[in-house]
Amino acid sequence: MQGQTKSVSFDGREIKLTTGRFAPQAGGSVMIECGDTSVLVTATKSSGREGVDFLPLMCDYEERLYAAGRIPGSFMRREGRPPERATLISRLIDRPMRPLFPGWMRDDIQIVATCLSLDERVPADVLAVTGASMATLMAGIPFQGPMAAVRVGLLGDDFVLNPSYREIERGDLDLVVAGTPDGVVMVEAGANQLSEQDVIEAIDFGYEAITELINAQKEVLKESGIKQEMPKAPEIDDTISTYLDKNCTKSISEVLKNFDQTKEERDNKIEEIKISISAKIDGLKDDNAVKKSLSLNNKLLENSYKALTKKLMREQIIKEGKRVDGRELNEVRAIDADAAVLPNRVHGSALFQRGLTQVLSTATLGTPSDAQEMDDLNPNTDKTYIHHYNFPPYSVGETRPMRTPGRREVGHGALAERALIPVLPAKDTFPYVLRVVSEVLSSNGSTSMASVCGSTLALMDAGVPLKAPVGGAAMGLIKEGKEVRILTDIQGIEDFLGDMDFKVAGTEKGITALQMDMKITGLPIETIGEAINQALPARTHILGKMLDAIETPKDNLSPHAPRLLSFRIDPELIGTVIGPGGRTIKGITERTNTKIDIEDGGIVTIASHDGAAAEEAQRIIEGLTRKVHEGEIFPGSITRIIPIGAFVEILPGKEGMIHISQLSEARVEKVEDVVKVGDQVTVRVREIDNRGRINLTLRGVSQNGGMSNYPEPTPTPVAPLT
């Protein structure tokens, strides 16, 4: 079971593609490896199902914790529901693959990528995307590939190909680009306010590298004796489409050119035309070719009518430069933005509306212990900024069961989250964990970018000192032959009937996130650059409208938000603060009614709704961690008495003991003869033993009162002379 292995030298690393060895019953399989990262990707096709009028493509990325030498933390010690990271990588595979299958395909296709070994220097996601293309080609599935993906980072002024996790964290760019010989089909990126030109150059840099991986796949196919052939598309009966073209073109065009109507009015009129033509067909004789054609496929009318509407809308944009709502190609819809739309029990809130797209965003401030722990293969184990995106059915006037968030919700939330990360305050100056929730109240395109805008406003309303506000817009594209038109701020119908959805988010300074999906087999870098540059004035306009709602972050937090104190202690003294079995820190939290978090590096964060209580907890911890030296004198309070001495709290939470022999210059029979609990005394540190215990003394130390019965020294009796 050796199989065939093709090695590609790729930017100083070796990428291996092994076929014919693993998963022999899958339609096609490849083990793609780089360093110690290994991903098995399979592609399998089954025959289509009756009545399906779309491509039922399933892309799944599976993580196994054994890949990193770990055992799952669940009760059953087994991987459970896919983590968010796996969902995002599944989408990353799906997005460049889907447009490369022929439009007529209706067979079930499943691509499964399983990470079997993970090298922290080599992320698995881009390998999985490239492997998906190779496995599909090996399976002989009709596919307009090969396709490959790479990651591009930016360290200083230099682009880095397929950077490690550490390099991604240190760099100013994390960009994934996927492409075919025809051009770029997918882009996903997070950036630290980079200029448009820098991002365009990064995409170009990545696309050039893709060529090597595309050629390697072609060589594997050749060595395996597999010929890549695209079957002819099934013949489509054009009787219905010809009939609709003749009978509906004029009426649909009139609706699309009426710019004074609302979306609802336009949709209703287009639906009325369809109902009318359907009734007209029903009235035809049974032997009429149109009626006979429709009787063989009852979905033919619906599909042909959609295709005609799509064609007419696209022609109007290409030939007349006018969109269905009357906007120019580079025009943004009307914007309305408000901050503090909910009572201040919600720490921050905002309502952002662009056209018929409306999003309510809320911001909540939490303590470090509220960070989200990530039980996946990502080396970063927790998240301190979380964005959740909700898309209820009423937002598009529909009814359906309310279930857990799907892949789309997870993906949109992650994009909006990524857009804000570069402008969040540093952890050491603003140690809060932040959660933003974006509720889509109405959707007509670009809800993810509306969530970016709403998130910014909600965080500013919550008093989060953002480095800069972030806004975003979705760009679209219509391509007919050599004619290309780029659309700014696309609405729902333009997204559905167009060729591209390109979301660009950023500040006035530069881009923080972008995501491009295509419905065609590739786009040249020049066109992508044009779209990115056209998004800049739109973003500037949107940011201006946002700043009209709230110009700067609020100076004060909501009275219902926790107050945090953050300071650093010696990491070696963390155990002292925690105490045996956590007793010390538990005692502090109960005494002060606070919440305390301590990081491994010694950063202590105290949370409380009462500022004085937080300061008291800080005073206690600083007392516990303050080093005491022999000879120092402290005022203190007697806390407890034992037969051989008394304990004194000399610093908050730190006690020392006065041995009975150190209570007085004179002999003391009982400790209670000198001191009692609650007495205020002044003590000197006599010694600190090898176990760190503090031994105190009262001898030779001036007292300022407060002791119960401090005896004066008496002379030692002298034995009589004999």
Swiss-Prot record:
MF (Gene Ontology): 3'-5'-RNA exonuclease activity; magnesium ion binding; polyribonucleotide nucleotidyltransferase activity; RNA binding
UniProt keyword RNA-binding, yes or no: yes
Binding locations of Mg(2+): D495, D501
PROSITE patterns xrefs: KH_TYPE_1 (PS50084), S1 (PS50126)
Occurrences of domain KH (ranges): 562-621
Domain S1 motif: 631-699
Catalysis: reaction(s): RNA(n+1) + phosphate = RNA(n) + a ribonucleoside 5'-diphosphate
EC number: 2.7.7.8
Major subcellular site: cytoplasm
Keyword terms: Cytoplasm, Magnesium, Metal-binding, Nucleotidyltransferase, RNA-binding, Transferase
Subcellular location: Cytoplasm
An individual GO BP term: RNA processing
SUPFAM superfamilies linked to this entry: Eukaryotic type KH-domain (KH-domain type I), Nucleic acid-binding proteins, Polynucleotide phosphorylase/guanosine pentaphosphate synthase (PNPase/GPSI), domain 3, Ribonuclease PH domain 2-like, Ribosomal protein S5 domain 2-like
InterPro entries: ExoRNase_PH_dom1, ExoRNase_PH_dom2, ExoRNase_PH_dom2_sf, KH_dom, KH_dom_type_1, KH_dom_type_1_sf, NA-bd_OB-fold, PNPase
CDD domains: KH-I_PNPase, RNase_PH_PNPase_1, RNase_PH_PNPase_2
Chain residue ranges for the region called Disordered: 700-722
Top EC class for this record: transferase
UniProt cofactor(s): Mg(2+)
Role, per record: Involved in mRNA degradation. Catalyzes the phosphorolysis of single-stranded polyribonucleotides processively in the 3'- to 5'-direction.
HAMAP family named in the record: PNPase (MF_01595)
Name of the featured protein: Polyribonucleotide nucleotidyltransferase
Lineage of source species: Bacteria, Bacillati, Cyanobacteriota, Cyanophyceae, Synechococcales
